[in-house]
Design a protein with these regions (language model features):
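Short cysteine clusters
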Residues: 140
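Cell wall/extracellular polymer interaction/catalysis modules
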Residues: 1-137, 147-164
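A conserved hydrophobic position in a structured secondary element of the catalytic/binding core
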Residues: 143
Length: 164
């Protein structure tokens, strides 16, 4: 089942409207690495990553795995591991998944630029926990943790990020 995301910062799901944060560059059909935009299109949820030291394993049908201190995500378009989860330390530019804030306490890896990976088309596009003020992301979609858990429990399988 697909939730609809709009550029005004709302996510529609089963007759409800939820507040969400989007990339600081809005929603774009021309996603590029570093543009800060959320990619337009249907983004399937591939798997869940979670901080087992902070939350219980999420329920639902998606594969899930805990985030460890050695987990990262390569965002260096020049490296062979671009847009893949990596083990830290890693020689290329990367994000650490084990963050000190709570944004990555629960992460749904979205199917963007992963089949196949195309260098420079964007990496680390996730559905994750929003900041308290719903500040813009670097291109991800972010929700309050209770809303994110509800969507997963109710069987959401994809996001449709729309530019209209």
């Amino acid at each position: 089942m697909i939730a609809e995301v709009r550029g005004n910062g709302t996510l529609a799901w089963r007759g409800r409207r939820l507040r969400c944060a989007l990339g600081r560059g809005g929603i774009t059909t021309m996603k590029q690495e570093g543009d800060g935009a959320t990619p337009a299109g249907i983004l399937p949820l591939r798997r869940l990553l979670y901080r087992a030291d902070r939350i219980a394993p999420p329920t639902g049908a998606l594969p899930r795995e805990p985030i460890g201190t050695g987990d990262g995500w390569c965002d260096d378009p020049a490296h062979a591991d671009y847009n893949h989860q990596v083990t830290l330390p890693h020689p290329a530019r990367h994000e650490e998944l084990s963050r000190t804030d709570h944004l990555y306490d629960l992460v749904a890896v979205l199917g963007w630029n992963d089949d196949p990976v195309m260098r420079g088309r964007g990496s680390a596009i996730f559905l994750h926990v929003a900041r308290d003020d719903y500040a813009p992301t670097e291109g991800c979609v972010a929700l309050a943790l209770p809303d994110l858990l509800m969507l997963l429990t109710e069987g959401m399988t994809a996001l449709h990020a729309r530019t209209d």
